[in-house]
């Protein structure tokens, strides 16, 4: 890598926290940031859940650590962030990837499912942003990347809580960007399109729906977890120092059609 590319995109000496890092998109982002030079803190629902991610990072000689945290539990998030700061000294990059989804017609959608999705996808994201943001303000710099969705822009079908939460994530991203931009903290989001992950397994098993969705994607294919790596590195690096409050679509062109 040239000196210019290293200066612009290299993450050596940075501590990157990635939630929902046990598999899928979160694991792909964790590996990408690690290969770019960051120390990676992989967070899952339990320490055991991120063991496979830690193993992959270790094989790539990436300095890393794994933590368990209930994304819906405010006190647990606060404790986790404090422990990370105590053990690693700083947080340079936060990627809020952890999330959940519940499917049901709106008129049958339960309060329990609604609250679970909002707590994990929106409340938990805010708490991580707030607690990591405190440290970044002390440091005088930082990068926050929230994982939004195509449903930050459209309503979807039978996923009212998920759509509401991801719309909220997009607006939260902009609100925090407005507040922290002059403190050298960049807050942005990535909105993935249709990716081959556990969350989309059932959709992909419905051949008719799978073909309908695929035909609408200009690239003609679904994304793979490592397709988010470049976007994550860009938004984590010096190269994006004048990018703030942006929701970056990584969707194969879906929203352009």
Feature map (PLM): residue ranges:
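Residue(s) in the substrate-gating loop at a strand-loop-helix junction
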Residues: 149
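Conserved glycine-rich cofactor-binding loop
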Residues: 15, 22-24
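C-terminal substrate-recognition "lid" of short-chain dehydrogenase/reductases
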Residues: 126, 141, 185, 221-250, ...
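Alpha-helical segment proximal to the catalytic Tyr-Lys
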Residues: 134, 178-182, 241
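Active-site helix of classical SDR
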Residues: 129, 165, 173
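Conserved glycine-rich Rossmann-like NAD(P)H-binding loop of the short-chain dehydrogenase/reductase
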Residues: 38-52
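Substrate-binding pocket helix/loop in short-chain dehydrogenase/reductase
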Residues: 105-106, 113-118, 213
């Amino acid at each position: 890598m040239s000196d210019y590319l290293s200066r612009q995109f290299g993450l050596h000496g940075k501590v990157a926290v990635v939630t929902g890092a046990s598999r899928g998109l979160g694991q792909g982002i964790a590996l990408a940031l690690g290969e770019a030079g960051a120390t990676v803190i992989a967070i899952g629902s339990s320490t055991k859940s991120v063991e496979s991610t830690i193993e992959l990072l270790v094989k790539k000689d990436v300095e890393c650590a794994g933590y368990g945290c209930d994304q819906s539990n405010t006190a647990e998030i606060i404790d986790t962030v404090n422990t990370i700061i105590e053990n690693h000294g700083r947080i340079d990059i936060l990627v809020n990837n952890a999330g959940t989804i519940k499917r049901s017609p709106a008129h049958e959608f339960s309060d329990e499912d609604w609250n679970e999705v909002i707590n994990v996808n929106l409340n938990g994201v805010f708490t991580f942003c707030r607690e990591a943001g405190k440290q970044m303000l002390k440091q005088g710099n930082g990068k926050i990347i929230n994982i939004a969705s195509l449903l930050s822009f459209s309503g979807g079908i039978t996923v009212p809580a998920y759509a509401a939460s991801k719309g909220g994530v997009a607006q939260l991203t902009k609100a925090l960007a407005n507040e922290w931009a002059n403190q050298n903290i960049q807050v942005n989001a990535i909105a993935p399109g249709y990716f081959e992950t556990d969350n989309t397994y059932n959709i992909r098993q419905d051949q008719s729906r799978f073909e309908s969705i695929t035909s609408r994607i200009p690239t003609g294919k679904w994304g793979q977890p490592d397709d988010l790596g470049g976007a994550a590195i860009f938004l984590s690096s010096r190269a994006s120092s004048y990018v703030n409050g942006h929701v970056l679509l990584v969707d194969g062109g879906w929203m352009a059609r």
